[in-house]
Amino acid sequence: MAKPAARPRKKIKKTVVDGIAHIHASFNNTIVTITDRQGNALSWATSGGSGFRGSRKSTPFAAQVAAERAGQAALEYGLKNLDVNVKGPGPGRESAVRALNGCGYKIASITDVTPIPHNGCRPPKKRRV
């Protein structure tokens, strides 16, 4: 028996004033996620998803483009103020924060939340080029 056609649900438009921007800057890519205070994702973007491939993904310009895309997508929720959490040692840390500032957000705080091991896992071996 065929299922009855489900009516499309109306997307509830919520307005959020304060949010958190999580910037994960690794050596290979930069991921920017903008959430509300509870941690529910409003928008996200990556350097790879913004059209950069290979070694160009890990550039500061690619991180800037990813942050601009995530910031513009989150503007439709009425977001005004951002706290920024930066994680990782990648090259796109500062440029992503500057791009969010350029989108018109008022940045209240910038916090470095990079996990630091207390002598945990063994690090990868050093590169010999």
From Swiss-Prot:
Write out the GO MF terms. rRNA binding; structural constituent of ribosome
Describe its partners and assembly state: Part of the 30S ribosomal subunit. Interacts with proteins S7 and S18. Binds to IF-3.
Name the protein family.
Answer: Belongs to the universal ribosomal protein uS11 family.
Q: Which PANTHER family match?
A: 40S RIBOSOMAL PROTEIN S14/30S RIBOSOMAL PROTEIN S11
Q: Name one GO cellular component term.
A: ribosome
Q: Which NCBIfam families match?
A: PRK05309.1, uS11_bact
Q: Which gene encodes it?
A: rpsK
Q: What is this protein called?
A: Small ribosomal subunit protein uS11
Please give the function described in this protein's UniProt entry. Located on the platform of the 30S subunit, it bridges several disparate RNA helices of the 16S rRNA. Forms part of the Shine-Dalgarno cleft in the 70S ribosome.
Write down the PROSITE patterns for this protein, in alphabetical order.
RIBOSOMAL_S11 (PS00054)
> Which keywords fit this entry according to its UniProt record?
Ribonucleoprotein, Ribosomal protein, RNA-binding, rRNA-binding
Q: Which GO terms describe its biological process?
A: translation
Read off the InterPro entries from this record. Ribosomal_uS11, Ribosomal_uS11_bac-type, Ribosomal_uS11_CS, Ribosomal_uS11_sf
Entry superkingdom:
Bacteria
Recorded hits in Pfam families, A to Z, give: Ribosomal_S11
